[in-house]
Amino acid sequence: MYSGQNKIHKDKGVAPTEFEEQVTQALFDLENTNQELKSELKDLYINQAVQMDISGNRKAVVIYVPFRLRKAFRKIHLRLVRELEKKFSGKDVIFVATRRIMRPPKKGSAVQRPRNRTLTSVHEAMLEDVAYPAEIVGKRTRYRLDGTKIMKVFLDSKLKNDTEYKLETMVGVYRKLTGKDVVFEYPVIEA
């Protein structure tokens, strides 16, 4: 009995793609077979899943989760990513919360747009989602002579073991999602 359909909630009238069905089936199987994840996964669902080709022959699975369920997914993030990466062998799994960007209000309009709906705010929040579970401890923006920008993001070195293997994937996913160049690094700690 396939009942993974309640693991994905898309906009009305939009059917899930074949890849999204694979992801929801994997989540459904995890819920039924893995006892420690069963209770946490019971009420969780996703909005969308996309497979991205990153530089070289690497692939990434980007799973969009509802903004309201972001905290619940973060509680089980490490275990869930480990299990999903086993199922999708050779692909890095990244969870990103679904957020909306509102266009700036027209001149003379009295409508205020919330800060969390601005392009800058959404891109910063996506950066945090992509880098999770590592915490961002610093950012530097470097302007080259030709006018291009590169953002250096310093990650907390406590979780270096959990994130170091997918730094390249995180860079590629962030570039595809936002169009901005970013470099992830761990700050050198002087003893």
UniProtKB/Swiss-Prot annotation:
The modification N-acetylmethionine is found at M1. The keyword Acetylation applies. One of its GO terms (molecular function) is mRNA binding. Keywords: Acetylation, Coiled coil, Ribonucleoprotein, Ribosomal protein. InterPro entries: Ribosomal_eS7 (IPR000554), Ribosomal_eS7_CS (IPR047861). One of its GO terms (biological process) is translation. Residues 17-50 form a coiled coil. This is Small ribosomal subunit protein eS7y. The lineage of its organism: Eukaryota, Viridiplantae, Streptophyta, Embryophyta, Tracheophyta. The gene is RPS7B.
